[in-house]
């Protein structure tokens, strides 16, 4: 009997170990916003020139061509969707460029110190941009990574990643400008803030705050989508900046999420910077009613 028990144990133990290993390797399902499946992405790997892709945008919300910038080079890139070959125009020298938006026929590029570069979208095919305008000292001092342009209202929204009073107030502050296309001017049109204290108390984000890295808006619901690479979360807020939900992102799928945009089919796109082991990429999530 002892020999029989020993033989049973001899065969059962390896089976149990194998079962445990298989269970560990099973894909963990992460939460998704309503209408999207963050466990089922269409992945577009970037070329080496866009390893540090830091912002994405679409022209008139058309998803066939993606426009982007990367962290260090003052270049405005364009690619057909799922076409790795990129073309670009030079709009500035090397610096720290964090986000991009296209407002009708004008491109907006945000530098980390809050300086905004604008130039005609029509110049995207030129080797170098000729008609560039730079807006300095129009934002409160701080670090900025998020810009969104509303084609219907001609308004531009910017979020502060690190601003003096935000940590103390447990809030995230932002600024609104209206763009005068004819005069090529940004007119101050208000400020806003979002209370992040609840997220801090629930330990959904760090005590240092949300640290927004990208911003976009659902044109149908008016809801704001705010990405935080530091906290690995996507926050969805009401049109008046009240937090509605916080989506925890899978760090193995979202390596360093820095860019965010919708197309006219309501597909949601999130770009990720690459590193020594992986290429930069853009993840597309199709909308499911």
Where do the model's predicted regions map?
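Sequence/structural signature of beta-propeller domains
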Residues: 24-289
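Bacterial Sec-dependent N-terminal signal peptides
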Residues: 1-34
């Amino acid at each position: 009997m002892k020999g029989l028990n020993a033989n049973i144990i001899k065969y059962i133990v390896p089976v149990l170990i194998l079962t445990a290993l298989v269970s560990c390797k099973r894909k963990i399902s992460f939460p998704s916003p309503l209408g999207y499946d963050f466990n089922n992405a269409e992945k577009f790997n970037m070329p080496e020139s866009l390893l540090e892709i830091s912002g994405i945008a679409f022209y008139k919300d058309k998803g066939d061509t993606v426009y982007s910038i990367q962290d260090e080079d003052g270049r405005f890139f364009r690619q057909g969707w799922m076409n790795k070959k990129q073309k670009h125009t030079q709009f500035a020298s090397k610096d720290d460029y964090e986000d991009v938006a296209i407002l009708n026929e004008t491109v907006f590029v945000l530098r980390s110190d809050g300086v905004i570069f604008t130039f005609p979208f029509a110049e995207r095919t030129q080797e170098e941009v000729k008609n560039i305008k730079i807006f300095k000292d129009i934002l409160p001092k701080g670090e900025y990574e998020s810009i969104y342009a509303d084609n219907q209202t001609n308004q531009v929204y910017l979020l502060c990643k690190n601003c003096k009073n935000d940590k103390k107030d447990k809030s995230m502050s932002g600024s609104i400008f209206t763009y005068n296309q004819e005069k090529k001017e940004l007119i101050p049109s208000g400020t806003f803030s979002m209370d992040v204290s609840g997220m801090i108390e629930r330990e959904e984000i760090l005590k240092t705050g949300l640290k927004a890295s990208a911003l976009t808006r659902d044109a149908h619901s008016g809801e704001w989508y705010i990405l935080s690479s530091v906290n690995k979360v996507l926050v969805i807020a009401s049109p008046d900046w009240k937090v509605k939900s916080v989506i925890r992102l899978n760090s193995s799928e979202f390596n360093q999420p820095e860019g965010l945009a919708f197309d006219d089919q309501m597909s949601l796109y999130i770009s990720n910077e690459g590193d020594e082991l992986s290429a930069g990429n853009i993840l597309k999530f199709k909308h499911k009613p």
